[in-house]
Amino acid sequence: MKQKLLYLAAASLLSLNVQAQQDGFFTSKLEAQKKFESDYLKAVNYDQFKVHLTELTKNPHITGTPENELVKDYMVQVMSQAGMDVKVWPYDVYLPNHPGKSELQIISPVQLTLSQKEGELAEDPFSTDPRLHLGFNAFSGSGDVTAEVVYVNYGTREDFMKLVEMGVPLKGKIAIARYGGNFRGYKAKFAEQNGMIGLVVYTDPKDSGFTRGDVYPKGPFYNETTIQRGSMLTLDFTGDPLTPNRPALPLDGPIKVKRDDPATVDFHTIPVTPIGYGAAKEILSRMTGTDVPGAWQGGLPFTYKLTGGADLKVRVMVDQKPDFIRANNVVGTFIGKDHPDEWIILGSHYDAWSFGATDPNSGTAMLLTFAEALGKLYKNGQKPSRSILIGHWDAEEQGVIGSTEWVEHLRKELGAKAISYMNFDGGASGRNFGASAAPTLKKLIIDASKEVTYPDSAKTVFEIWAGKNEEPGIGNLGGGSDHIAFYMHVGIPSLSG
């Protein structure tokens, strides 16, 4: 997998370094292109991917912690040794990097405290690390509420409309929703709009769990304690919530940036807590109302109900305090020999909710290995035509913050110089290749995939990826990762793999 990704990245990037004519290259450039690709493959030390990934994921490293600072320092060291001109870009951003206080309890008809922490597994020594936090969603509202429960399916706008149509009382109730169907933040937004006072969110086994196949650690699907974390922000912009469209420069720096008053920002007001489906089962199995519509039935072995009934009371307590946190982006540059003011940018975030072995640091490790290989060529005089920038972004998990601040900081320069942006958030996850891209870069991915042999196979990545189709599907770019500011704010052609 790592070989496949490293070469796909190189093939795509190096193709952008050659003057294109219609669907191919000028003849005078083609041989140089092929030689560069061949020399790059010889320069890659694939064992370094594992070395980097092991070092990057030694500790849980959420934004603003000393452990994340160690990751930043390691990346600076590796990229500098590879010959890149490396710069750290600091920003002071407003976010929560700790769950604060959080409790979830059934108050009646029994008293039961529900787990908000993933289970410890003998097969996974990392799961016992005492530094791992409770599961939490950044930018939950704070509050302590006790109320009856309503099952809101995925918590989409349509789900809430259906509940209203069925006459289910929502005001003053606590919602329990399964992940999927929409962005998690909108589950809270729609619950608030309907007068609900709290939200419990979980991944149902029908969507990822024992009904799909073997669960972790035996298989890839969620076990009963697995908790999905993430940002709840539903503002009209990404990045630091107090500095829309302007960089959150350091508070102690020479340039002062206007910051909005947090009290004026449209943060969520209701407490939200994520849990595993084992804990959710304790609530759902005690609900006594009307049966849910057929499409709303989940994977737990009982009939789901719309309401919990008057006897079932649940307490949700969250006390989460955002604060100003120093986020550091690390950007390295190889100066292009022919067009130094034309930039091809690759990036991945490096902050993680826990250890980050897949999301995001498989992408981080790939980019470090990539930098080392290009550095060998660069030192031998084989310089790319255009400048290549590699960015490692901080504070992505709380709302795609670090990369957005950098783009806001360099908006004019990026608009004038950036040729493309390639995002590798979680570069290696499973055995199947997939990508999404701007329309102008989709053919580039297809062409690159035809040049790469699939691991342990005589077929190309393209052939495995396409299967029985003439061509594989490449999705359009949406939200959720660091391509957003490049593509949607500045209009830089982007891809995400």
Features from the language model and the residues they span:
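Bacterial Sec-dependent N-terminal signal peptides
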Residues: M1-G24
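Second-shell loop/turn segments in exported
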Residues: K35-A43, T57-P66, E103, G135-S140, ...
